[in-house]
Regions:
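N-terminal alpha-helical targeting/anchoring segments
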Residues: 2-186
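TRNA-recognition modules of translation machinery and tRNA-sensing kinases, especially anticodon-binding
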Residues: 97, 182-533
Length: 533
């Protein structure tokens, strides 16, 4: 059984040494903390233009120590050290006590300072000065302890995955619930429809992994001829639909800071490398590192595993008016996946490659409503959140897109062990691939609630009619979905679309009419005739 890796643990505590200490106030008690990153009068976020480094993530430790967090992590098959929640509760209690203590010491410092100024004799002044020195040393001791506790809290807190939607099925991938099926009835499995075998035909060759090995190494492929044209058409088709529905088109960088990827909770799944309880949990290296002589200035860089990462970074440190949400973007980018643990037949063709083109959907919505109780801010238990509705919107958009391609596909509500670190709920879409004789994932859509927003500092103002507007500014919710993952859609289209003559020779390739206006290769796929239906 695969274990879900734990994300983004190691980098942040080291940043604490250079980060000015700010109050954690687990329930966001102080609005003055917002002045470090946000303007109270402008919707435009304040961003660092020098180094681009973000403040440390703001986690809600009161939520993280709740009893259901441990069972949620277990349900998601996240391998946390047993001491995680005990240590969190211990350190949070100690942080509260130490913070109260330092506040009391500072109040006493103020009184002693007045005593120094009001001293009538040199002896009285010297006595007051000695008290001031003792208090100063005690304050410094408390501050060092607070800094240590904050580092410990963040280290443990970052290991804990997002909450899970109440309707998420429990268990492994096999427990996924089929939500709906679409398109024509699946045709029988047929080995001669295997896209690898079809690619071996000279008249149809549409990809080449052999030259990919020469240029880049195993696991890279060239799309050629009809394969390249099909990628262009699929991208244009997906962008047309998304832009028509109001998504802002974006071309993102393919290189991102490792810190940003960590904050998004992104590492493609693979077999976890586990340490013992007294060591940091480790995960396999699934992202390609970028070596640069400017690394000291730019920080550690990686190739993006998905455009979701740079799209999320677009909103870092943003403060939005709720009336402007949801904000929707669609990006064309490349996804880079090292997939160190991948083995077997899927490494032969296009199903699993190290680099591919992807059209990604991304949304930012308002967060959950908050209420004030006993000077604390808690989230209302509302499963009909704006982000829940946005997830359904993304799912419906994906269904419309794939229905236009005329392939058999189904939507799955993915179980807890398939959610990764960041997803609150996730739908996968699988297409029938008769040459593989199996359903294959072509898309997903995830609601990450405030998991990424807390790490990237994405907030919004209170609605005007919100009675809790005196509380801290809420965190936004982020969502992402795949419009097109090119290689697997090519597999689905070709394996479902080829037509054979009675003798078994290729007759034609049926492609959906919606792609015709984006096709620049006439009515041929290589040397094979295209029939548009």
């Amino acid at each position: 059984m695969r274990h879900m890796p734990v994300y983004g643990v190691s980098d942040y505590p080291n940043q604490l040494a250079n980060e000015p200490r700010v109050s954690l106030r687990p329930l966001g008690a102080s609005r003055r903390l917002l002045t470090r990153s946000y303007s109270a009068k402008s919707a435009s976020p304040k961003r660092s233009t020098s180094s681009g480094a973000l403040p440390l993530p703001k986690l809600n430790y009161e939520d993280l120590i709740q009893a259901d967090q441990a069972s949620n992590a277990k349900n998601r098959n996240v391998n946390l050290p047993e001491r995680t929640f005990v240590a969190l509760r211990r350190d949070l209690d100690a942080w509260k006590t130490t913070t109260r203590g330092v506040d009391e010491l500072r109040a006493r410092q103020s009184h002693v300072g007045e005593a120094v100024r009001a001293a009538a004799t040199p002896e009285d002044k010297e006595k007051a000065v000695r008290k001031a020195r003792v208090l100063r040393d005690s304050v410094h001791t408390h501050e060092r302890e607070i800094s240590r506790l904050e580092k410990s809290l963040l280290t443990y807190g970052l290991r804990i995955p997002n909450t899970s939607h109440p309707d998420v099925p429990l268990g492994p991938e096999s427990n996924a619930r089929i939500v709906s099926t679409h398109g024509p009835a699946p045709i029988p499995a047929d080995p001669k429809r295997d896209h690898n075998k079809l690619n071996d035909l000279a008249e149809m060759k549409f990809f080449d992994r052999d030259v990919g090995v020469i240029s880049s190494g195993a696991g890279f492929a060239y799309l050629r001829g009809g394969g390249a044209l099909l990628e262009v058409a699929l991208i244009a088709y997906a962008m047309e639909i998304a832009v028509r529905k109001g998504f802002e088109p974006v071309i993102t960088p393919d290189v991102v800071r490792r810190d940003i990827a960590d904050r998004c909770g992104f590492v493609p799944r693979d077999e976890e490398v586990k340490g013992d309880e007294d060591t940091e949990i480790k995960t396999p290296e699934q992202m390609y590192a970028v070596q640069s002589k400017h690394e000291s200035a730019e920080g550690s860089l990686v190739l993006a595993g998905t455009s979701e990462i740079p799209l999320a970074a677009m909103h870092a440190q943003a403060l939005y008016n709720p009336q402007t949400l949801p904000r929707r973007t669609v990006a064309v980018g490349h996804a880079f996946r090292a997939e160190a643990g991948a083995r077997g037949k899927d490494t032969r063709g296009l199903y699993r490659v190290h680099q591919f083109t992807k059209v990604e959907l991304f949304s930012v919505t308002t967060g959950e409503a908050t209420k004030r109780t006993d000077n604390q801010t808690t989230q209302q238990t509302n499963i009909d959140k704006p982000s829940d509705r946005e997830l359904e919107y993304l799912r419906e958009l994906q269904i419309e897109l794939y229905a236009g391609l005329g392939i058999p596909f189904r939507v799955l509500d993915m179980p807890s062990e398939e959610l990764g670190a960041s997803a609150h709920r996730k739908y996968d879409i699988e297409a029938w691939m008769p040459g593989r004789g199996a359903w294959g994932e072509i898309s997903s859509a995830s609601n990450c609630t405030d998991y990424q927003a807390r790490r990237l500092h994405i907030r919004h103002r209170h609605p005007h009619d919100d009675t809790s507007s005196a509380g801290p500014l809420p965190y936004a919710h982020t969502l992402n979905g795949t419009a097109v993952a090119v290689p697997r859609l090519i597999i689905a289209l070709i394996e479902n679309g080829v037509r054979f003559k009675e003798g078994g020779d290729l007759e034609c390739l049926v492609l959906p009419t919606v792609l015709r206006k984006h096709w620049v290769g006439g009515d041929k796929f290589g040397e094979i005739e295209i029939r548009w239906e």
